[in-house]
């Protein structure tokens, strides 16, 4: 079975995914591989799957509460949106039975993980996959360590290459992930360039699994911005934004050029907390200036 071994969290609920779980699958069920890929994986495990798909957030909250969902599968950004919708519905997070979230389909930072775990009171695990290979399940974090994604090496051979030269890089060096399928009968791929940036970690994991791990995806090689000679990944900016109270993880980066200089403009989505925080800070600053 492809699942994370159970551990415990502070409320004494198990984490991971087992046959006894009720899995709320909020990945899209259209042409996107996430929905059906996760669906059939949960069925193979023997757990109960709720094929909710994306959208209809109020309905999702109702189903999650009515069916007693224990595991949430979605994009990390949608998990945060769900957390707000749960509160808007007048429900207490503690009354839900969720204990684990399995999130993928988009890059996300450790700051975002901390926010999800805090708002939903779950353990948030990262899962990796891509349509060309097999969808979700190429690699997943264990609930014991949450420190890198274990690659299913009986099915996939992974390498790291220099994205510019294509030369292989040793373990520990960051670069582009290349995947060779070992068990696919339909459309096998040899040294497929994913454009995903990560590194291989060969240090034994404390969970005891011997499969090598890849670090959290840092971004795509074609997402990397070079601003005045400095390599910048959107996830680095996201980490800074999420440290500011009142700023949501929804943002837009606009790169332009003035003369010979690159200009990066960051547009963010904010809520009322930001204005109240900034307002109090400005009020204190103005008060000090008046007294002086």
Each language-model region and where it sits:
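Short, small-residue-biased leader/transition segments that mark boundaries at the very start
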Residues: 3-10, 287-290
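Conserved ATP-dependent adenylate/AMP-binding module captured primarily in the ANL superfamily
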Residues: 9-22, 57-69
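Conserved AMP-binding loop of ANL adenylate-forming enzymes
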Residues: 13-49
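Active-site glycine/GP-rich loop and adjacent strand/helix microenvironment
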Residues: 45-292
């Amino acid at each position: 079975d492809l699942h994370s071994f159970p551990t415990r969290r502070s409320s004494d609920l198990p984490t991971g995914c087992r046959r006894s779980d009720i899995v709320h699958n909020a990945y899209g069920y259209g042409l996107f591989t996430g929905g059906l890929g996760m669906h059939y994986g949960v069925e193979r495990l023997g757990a109960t799957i709720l094929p909710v798909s994306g959208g209809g957030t109020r309905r999702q909250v109702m189903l999650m509460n009515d069916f007693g969902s224990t595991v949430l599968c979605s994009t990390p950004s949608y998990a945060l949106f769900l957390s707000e919708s749960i509160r808007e519905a007048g429900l207490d997070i503690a009354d839900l039975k969720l204990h684990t979230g399995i999130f993928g389909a988009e890059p996300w930072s450790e700051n975002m993980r901390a926010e999800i775990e805090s708002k939903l009171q779950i353990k948030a695990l990262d899962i990796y996959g891509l349509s060309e290979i097999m969808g979700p399940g190429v690699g997943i974090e264990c609930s014991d360590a949450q420190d890198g994604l274990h690659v299913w090496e009986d099915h996939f051979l992974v390498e790291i290459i220099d994205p510019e030269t294509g030369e292989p890089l040793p373990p520990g060096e960051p670069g582009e992930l290349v995947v060779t399928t070992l068990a696919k009968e339909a459309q096998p791929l040899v040294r497929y360039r994913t454009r995903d940036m990560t590194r291989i970690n060969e240090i034994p994991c404390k969970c005891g699994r011997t499969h090598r791990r890849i670090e959290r995806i840092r971004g795509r090689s074609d997402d990397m911005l070079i601003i005045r000679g400095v390599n910048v990944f959107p996830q680095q900016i996201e980490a800074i934004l999420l440290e500011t109270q009142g700023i949501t993880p929804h943002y837009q980066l606009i790169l332009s050029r003035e003369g010979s200089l690159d200009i990066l403009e960051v547009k963010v989505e904010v809520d009322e907390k930001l204005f109240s925080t900034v307002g109090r800070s400005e009020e204190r600053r103005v008060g000090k200036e008046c007294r002086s």
